[in-house]
Amino acid sequence: MTGLERQLTEMLEAPVGALGYELVGLEFIRAGEHSTLRVFIDHENGIFVEDCAEASRQISAVMDVEDPITVAYNLEVSSPGLERPLFKAAHYQQFVGHEVSLVLKMPMNNRRKWKGDILDINGEIVTVTVDGNNEEFALSNISKANLVPKF
């Protein structure tokens, strides 16, 4: 998570929470004129289009006042979806036993991409069973983590 993403998360958790939603996480993708702020929300009863619209209005209002992003961007608000992104240690704990796809910031054993089942989370270290071996990953070295849907 970048410094900006951390700042945005801290800024938006309370307003999104006040609407009754969990701020699962967010991503800011810089792409010149086409930058995107992608915000993932969840609720115990699921997320519907109306929920995303309500959260989008609230987030837009906060962003207009605070103005933390200096470039033009598009705001996207959605549920985490089937390939749910994992941002926090609590997310890994919630999905112990599920398959996860990881992309690392710095390679480990000459690999940046890993896929396996979440075995455990201990502090800031997640253990994933990959091809029968237990591999430990520091959360600070994970640039992207998503659940792998089972069909």
UniProtKB/Swiss-Prot annotation:
Keywords: Cytoplasm, Ribosome biogenesis. GO terms for biological process: ribosomal small subunit assembly; translation. Its main location: cytoplasm. Disulfide bonds: none annotated. Pfam families: DUF150_C, RimP_N. It is found in: Cytoplasm. The keyword Flavoprotein does not apply. GO terms for cellular component: cytosol. InterPro entries: Ribosome_maturation_RimP (IPR003728), RimP_C (IPR028998), RimP_C_sf (IPR036847), RimP_N (IPR028989), RimP_N_sf (IPR035956). Belongs to the RimP family. HAMAP family: RimP (MF_01077). Required for maturation of 30S ribosomal subunits. This is Ribosome maturation factor RimP. The gene is rimP.
